[in-house]
Design a protein with these regions (language model features):
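Short S/T/G/P-rich N-terminal loop/turn motif that feeds into the first structured element of a domain
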Residues: 1-83
Length: 83
């Protein structure tokens, strides 16, 4: 069964290109350690909720976007040795 590490972060909108470049470097490294897939998803239609939402979860400022990413590993043992 696959094992997933998930991440939710706030990234300054003005730093999007730098984030993408950094994420690409990280992705290549983590794949060498056994990850099957790495995804970064830049939010473009994430509404603000009434009680809670992704924006509040990361305390995103008005100039920041929410990024949801995950690493898929073949199993927990590979993840533990890769991290």
């Amino acid at each position: 069964m696959s094992y997933i590490d998930g991440f939710l972060i706030a990234v300054p909108v003005a730093q999007r290109d730098a984030f993408i470049q950094h994420a690409g470097t990280f992705d290549a490294i983590i794949l060498e350690y056994g990850a099957v897939r790495v995804m970064e998803c830049w939010a473009d239609d994430v509404p603000h909720g009434k009680l809670t939402d992704f924006h509040r979860a990361v305390q995103a400022r008005d100039d920041e976007a929410v990024v949801f990413s995950w690493i898929e590993w073949p199993d927990k043992a590979t993840r533990d040795s890769g991290m």
